[in-house]
Amino acid sequence: RPSFCNLPVKPGPCNGFFSAFYYSQKTNKCHSFTYGGCKGNANRFSTIEKCRRTCVG
């Protein structure tokens, strides 16, 4: 799995409400979170399928 999968979930400082998904190393699963729309990090996916395909394997 790519190293960015191990980054912590980071909603970012902006106030948008965008549905996104991140990989949790602790649970070895993808979870939903609300992305604010700016900054954040690479551990953010638009669909749970993309998250699973990239980080869970």
From Swiss-Prot:
The cellular location(s) given in this protein's UniProt record come to: Secreted
Q: Please give the start and end residues of each transmembrane region.
A: none
Domain called BPTI/Kunitz inhibitor: residue spans: 5-55
User: Industrial or biotech applications?
Assistant: Is a new promising drug for aquaresis-related diseases, including hyponatremia, and a molecular probe to visualize in vitro and in vivo V2R expressed physiologically or under pathological conditions. Is a new promising therapeutic agent against polycystic kidney diseases (PKD). It shows renoprotective effect on the murine model for PKD, since the number of renal cysts and the total area of cysts is significantly reduced after treatment with this protein.
UniProt-reported outcome of changing R44E: 14-fold decrease in affinity for human V2R
Q: Which family does it belong to?
A: Belongs to the venom Kunitz-type family.
Q: What's the protein name?
A: Mambaquaretin-1
